[in-house]
Structures are given as C-alpha cells and as structure tokens.
Design a protein with these regions (language model features):
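Conserved, mostly hydrophobic/aromatic
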Residues: 37, 61, 83, 115, ...
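Structured core elements
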Residues: 78, 101, 121-123, 143-145, ...
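Charged (often Lys/Glu-rich) extended helix/loop segments that serve as interaction or gating elements
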Residues: 266-419
Length: 419
C-alpha cells in the first residue's frame, strides 16, 4: 500500500490534488501515477537482473490500457498475454512480437492461426494444443507450460498451479510432452509454470523454481534439449492492508536465481508480474452521493460500484479507503462504502474508520490498478468510467468514459419486432 502526501488535508497524486483531478475529469475515475508505474517496473527488473539475465513479462491481463502498456514498453518490459486480443493490444502499444509470450488455455484453432501469423512465442498448455499447432506449422520455437502441483494465491479462485487445476501439462506427462514436441518438429526453448496470484509468501516461488529446474535437467539428460529460459510465471503480491508487508524482493530474486544458476545451464530467467507493477500505481476516485444511517450501520453511498471495481465483491478483497478531501483528519465513524448497483454484494469497503463524511466528499480506493478497469462491466446499464494518467503536475485522459450509445451500439432489434 502506497503512502500519499497530504497538502491542506487533500490527498496528492503526483503534484496534483485528487480533488482537482476529480473536478476536472469527473467520477468515478481511475487515476494512475506514471512515476509509480515506472518505479515499480524498475524495482523488480533491477532486483532480478542484478543476479542473472532476466526477462520481466508484464502480465497484461492485470491492466491493458494502451498508455500503461506504452509506458512499460519504454521501460523495456516484455509481455505475458493470455488472448489474441491482449497480443494485438500490446502490438498496438509498440511491443515487437518477439517480446510477447502467449500463454493461453483451451486455445481454439483460429487463435493458433492468429498467433502463428503474428510470430509471437507460444507457451503450449496441453498436448492437444501442441498437436493442433503442428498441423499449422513446425520448426518454430515454443515454450511448454507444466502444472507444478504447487499452488498459491490470495484467494482460492486465483490458485493456478495446484494439482487438479486446468492449467498446464500434468507432472507425469511433462517428459513425454517435450519428447513429442521434438518429434513433431517443434523447438522447445522454454519451460513455464505459474502457481497463482497475489502471494506474499516466498516459499511457493522457491518451490516452483525447484520443480522447473529438476524438469529442465531431466529434459536435457533424457532428450538432449537445452532450454533457453525458465519462467516461473507471476503471482508476486502487494500489501493491500496497512499492517501487511511486501515480499523482500531482493532476497527473493537472489535465492531464486541462485537455484537456477547453480543447478542448470539455462542462460535466461523469466517471470510475469502484473499486480506488482500496476496495482498500487492507481487509485479509484469516487464521489459520495448519499449517507445513510441504518441501525448500527453507516453507509457511504458512492458513484462507483462492483461494476467499476469488482474485486471486493468477487474475491472479498480488501482495498484501503480514504476520504481524499479530509485526508489528514482522524477517523470518527465506521462506514461501509457501497455503490449504486442493485445487489446486496455491491460494496467497495466494509467497516472502515473514516473522518465524518458529507455528501459530495471524494473517496479514494487504493491499489486499484490491477484487475480494476479490466474486470469492470456495464451491469445495470451503467457505462464504464474514464481513466487518467498523471505525470507530476500533468494529467492526461487515457480512456474516455462510455455513453449509453456504447452500451447499445452492438445491439439490434429484428425487423419482425418493428412491425
């Protein structure tokens, strides 16, 4: 969780007050601090490259805004994409295809054709996918994703590496998969696994590295395949709560890269952070519409709901909240911060001690840059909101708000109903 400066009780984002930004662009509004975004990437990039050559593949499913991707392209990031759409958005943002790794699941043939045409590196998820790919092309480099039977994550819904999940080739089929890839004419150059999302425990990252190292050595000994990179996926979490501490990134990088360097001849390490890079770079600003006392409950009704930020409703996730125009004042009242959606589960925060609020106040929801806008919806026929990028004292619109026309533009009434 980031610390923000306060000037005259106003929360500052860059050199601008949150109130000033909200007054200019309206609410609800996602606001990203470009300098925080760059700093986060540099921190993880430098931590790992200090010990061995490392490719940081930004997991763009966390946030695919073109401007954010452009910033990361400038910083030298690679991309982890999970759909053809993410591949194409990344290319439009300036990424060369050879900086994109595609890791799909349940991949249809039409997507395989598109990926081959775009010449991105495909991270094969299943033997079925591999066989279908070789009907289109052979003699291309590929990576193979395994299921390491090592799972972790902030919620059971984001654990991807545990035994029984849908991702990757099961451990007992890994050697056979690499053998078949070689026999089919593919060139396996990488091995990949992903444990889950949002972890603050170092052990799963160490465990999955050890699993991949063991397989890499077995693959080289049995099949004569010398891999070019080892990829442990993403999942590095951030401290969403004030009392939480983030991972010691330098220690983690040193320990993991040591395992790879000392036990393999693989020249390049790779990982796929998403949340770590974008989450705390962004706040969601939302205006107080309504204040309601209901028995022991005090509700702050704001103009953002789970249509805007679904993580609290979907995962039960904690996001820190503050009243941006009363930023330095002490807490007086416990509030539930709720939205305008017609669902009981529509809340952004529960039981938060905040300064006594008034209608028109501005609430800031922290750490909203990862899985925020990308998971938003038009539920209750509410258009999706604007996004803004702040660089010091400059604020730029990087996504326009939708309108009712945007909601309706792909809908049609059959002519027979117009009679």
């Amino acid at each position: 969780m980031r610390d923000f400066e306060s000037v005259d009780n106003n929360m500052m984002i860059g050199k601008l007050s949150a109130v000033e930004i909200a007054d200019r662009f309206g609410t609800p509004l996602y606001v990203t601090d470009e300098n925080a975004l760059r700093d986060n990437f540099r921190k993880i990039n430098e931590a790992f490259n200090r010990h061995m050559p490392t490719r940081i593949h930004y997991a763009c499913k966390a946030n695919t805004n073109l401007a954010i991707l452009r910033v990361l392209e400038q910083e030298g990031s690679f991309i982890d994409a999970v759909s053809v759409g993410e591949v194409d958005i990344s290319i439009r943002a300036g990424f060369a295809p050879n900086r994109i790794l595609y890791s799909g699941v349940s991949v249809p043939n039409k997507d395989l054709k598109a990926l081959v045409a775009r010449e991105v590196l495909i991270n094969i998820d299943s033997i079925s996918e591999m066989r279908r790919l070789t009907k289109l092309v052979t003699d291309i480099p590929v990576s193979i994703r395994i299921n390491p039977a090592v799972g972790s994550g902030h919620h059971e819904k984001v654990v991807t590496g545990a035994k029984g999940t849908k991702f990757g080739i099961p451990k007992d089929q890994v050697i056979a998969a690499f053998r078949e890839a070689k026999e089919l004419g593919l060139r396996p150059v990488g091995i990949h696994a992903h444990t889950g999302s949002g972890g603050l425990n170092t052990q799963p990252f160490i465990d999955v590295t050890q699993v991949l190292v063991a397989f890499a050595n077995e693959i080289e000994e049995e099949l004569g395949i010398s891999l070019e990179f080892l990829d442990i996926g993403g999942g590095i979490g951030i401290p969403y709560r004030p009392e939480e501490k983030g991972l010691d990134l330098d220690s983690l990088a040193e320990e993991i890269t040591y395992i790879v360097k000392e036990n393999t001849s693989i020249p390049t390490f790779a990982l796929e952070p998403g949340r770590f890079i974008v989450a705390d770079s962004t706040v969601l600003l939302t205006r107080v519409n309504d204040i309601k006392e209901a028995g022991e409950k005090n509700f702050l009704g704001v103009d953002a709901g789970f249509n805007t930020l679904i993580r609290p409703a979907f995962y039960g996730s904690y996001h820190h909240a503050a009243i941006a125009n009363r930023f330095s004042l002490p807490g007086e009242v416990n509030y539930d911060i709720v939205g305008p959606i017609c669902e009981t589960s529509d809340y952004l925060a529960k039981d938060r001690l905040l300064p006594k609020a008034e209608e028109g106040d501005l609430v800031a929801i922290y750490d909203a840059g990862a899985y925020g806008f990308v998971m938003s919806s038009q539920y209750n026929s509410r258009p999706r909101c604007r996004e803004v990028l702040v660089d010091g004292e400059h604020a730029s619109l990087i996504r326009e708000a939708e309108s009712l026309d945007d909601i309706l533009k792909h809908q049609r009434i059959p002519s027979r109903l117009m009679l």
